[in-house]
Structure formats: C-alpha cells, structure tokens
C-alpha cells in the first residue's frame, strides 16, 4: 500500500497545472485499483458509432461512470440495456479531459434483471390484465379545444416548448399550468394530486409532460398510483414523458401517447391554416369545372358557326358576346372569391383575440353551401344565354332572303348582276338571269312595258 502518495508523486511543494494534476491522479488510481469487481445496475447506456459503450453503474446510494471499449465489448454475451443488473471487472481510472473518475472495464457479466425493469414489467402486466390499456377505454381528443391543462414542472424547457407550439398554431387556446414535481419520490403524490385537480376544473384536455432523462429520472411516471390517477381521469389526457424512445406506464394508460411534449401540443393545437387550405382547394376545383364547361360550350359554338354559313357576321358577333360574358363572369367570380378571401383573412386576424371555435362550424357550413350554389348558378346563366342565342338564330333564318327563294320566288339579275326591281330597268330583247332557290335560268325580255314583263326562256 502507498503510505504517502503525495510524497511519492512529489506534490509536497510543487505547483501543478490542472492537466498535470489529473495525469498524476490517474496514475495513482490505476496503480492502487488495478482490477476490481463491482456490482450494480446499468443506466444512461450509450452506444456511439465507434463501437465503444458508456454507461453509469449505480446502486441505491451511489453511482460511477463506466467505459467498455470495442475490443472488450465484442466479448460481452449479454445484451446490455438500462436497468440491467450486472457484475463488472476493470481498473479505476480518471478521464483527464474532464477530471471524471471512471471504471475502464474488461468484463461485464449479468447479475440478474434490474429491479426497475422487473418492477416496470410486473406493473405493466398487472394493469394490462385489468384492461387499463384497452382501446375501448381511450377517449378521443377534442378537435378544437378552448382550455387545456398542462401538468408539468413550472420551470424548464417543457412548458416553454408547449407554449411556443400553441402560440404558433393556435394562440386563441387558453393554457393553464398545474405545477408539480416530475422527479423523485415526492413527485409521485404531487403528480396524482395535480391530475385529480386538473380533472375537476373542466378543461377540454390535459397534457401530462416531462422532458427526457434516465429510467430513474422518469420512474415516478411508472408508479402504480400515477397510472391509476391517469386511468381514472374523465378529461382526455395526453401522456408526453421523455423522448420518443422513452416509454412509461402512463403512456399505456393515457388516452393518447405523444413522443415528446411538443408533439403533444401539436396534437391539441388546431391548425388555423386548414380552413384557408380548404378554401383554396375549393377555388381550384370550381375554376377547373368552370373552365371545362366553358371550353366545351365554346367548342360546340365554334362547330355550329362553321356549319351555319349565313349570316356569318351575326354569328361572329354572338360568339364575341359570349366571350365577353365569359370574361365578365370570370371577373365577377374572382371578385366575389377575393372578397370572401379578404373576409376570411379578417376573421383569421381576429382569431387571436377571440375564440372562433363556436363559429367555425357555421363558417364551414356556409362555405359548403356557397360551393354547391355557385356551379348551379353558372349552369343556369349559360343555359339562359344559349336559349336566347338559339331564338335569335331562328329569327335570322326567317327574315333571310334565302327563305323567300325557298317559297318559290326568284330574283332577276341584269348582265352586271344588279337586281331588277322595275320593268323600266329592262329593254326588249335584254338577257337576264333568274336566280331560284335551287339553280339559275337565263331568260330574255319580250315586252318591257310597265305592265307585267313577258319573259321567254332562251334556247
């Protein structure tokens, strides 16, 4: 044994740097504790990409850090995990960079299941057999909560993260903190009292939250008293304990488990952008339907225009009129839609100061009604315009000179193609053209007195 380690290391008068002190302390520890066996329970196990393992070995009264390097880790047969009771062998050393006292291990043997893990599995099996985890017991979360109770520590990042999520997504929701300790033996009774108090205050939903930590740090959420308080809660409750990889008994009993406290807030924070997205979707659908219908009618009109050669100018005017109505209808539709979007934006701006949950259903119903009425109104307008167009087309066909020829009349034309309206425009022997409904005749004037003209067909 070393009777005077300071004398041996030359520390009686020498002034050392921190690095020198840590280096000599490491040498001293490794010289005295070259190989020791220690039994305890693993916690805070870490496996970096290097293949080394780092964890804390603890018992009920103390803990020590351990390092198991890759060449020795490959020889460990037992899969290591938090809560596992093990017996380890190694040398006592010092990590000089931080001045941390630690064990450098060469052997790890199982010493039976960890007490905490055994207690966890036993309680999980017991409560599961009672049906406390069944899906039939789970209560649905409210779609648009107005008041939410948050059961967590009043300090730390958890409450700030939850407030931040609600401030960003749903600032109109009222948040109420029910403070409690979230670690240690005294936290168990506090959490139970906080759950019962929150359940009696008429909140729309509750969040039971805590940040990450070791199995021991989170253990109060694995206690039977806390689990039964969660199960007895009438208000829908979300359990958000630890990180995504952490699982607690309260997660199984709660109505919904969230991987993190921020995720729990997102589950309960209604997204006000959803209504705007729905309106934009309806706008796109209505515009597409309107464009398809107008394109179909325009193509049909163009087809009719090509088939009706007379009177072409009137048809072109009607087509232009229809295009004008089309553009006016589009402008009116866009004006109406923009007005409704502006009104929705104003309502959205008031959400932060008011509670819009009561009016949200009414606004959705009104929006659905408008979405159903607008295509029907458009079809009625197009139908009326089409009927008026057909009526005017029939009127044009009645007064057309071609209709007169079809009833048996003819038109006399002179050599220059001018219409003959009086006998005075002709002379005896003059050759004329008689245009009929179908074909033409070449005729000659026999007598051009003011009495009816006598015509004869030319040989």
From Swiss-Prot:
Keywords: Cytoplasm, Exonuclease, Hydrolase, Nuclease. The keyword Nucleotide-binding does not apply. GO terms for cellular component: cytoplasm; exodeoxyribonuclease VII complex. Its main location: cytoplasm. One of its GO terms (molecular function) is nucleic acid binding. It is an enzyme of class 3 (hydrolase). One of its GO terms (biological process) is DNA catabolic process. InterPro entries: Exonuc_VII_L (IPR003753), Exonuc_VII_lsu_C (IPR020579), OB-fold_nuc-bd_dom (IPR025824). It is found in: Cytoplasm. It catalyses: Exonucleolytic cleavage in either 5'- to 3'- or 3'- to 5'-direction to yield nucleoside 5'-phosphates. Belongs to the XseA family. Bidirectionally degrades single-stranded DNA into large acid-insoluble oligonucleotides, which are then degraded further into small acid-soluble oligonucleotides. NCBIfam families: xseA (TIGR00237). This is Exodeoxyribonuclease 7 large subunit. It comes from Pseudomonas putida (strain ATCC 47054 / DSM 6125 / CFBP 8728 / NCIMB 11950 / KT2440).
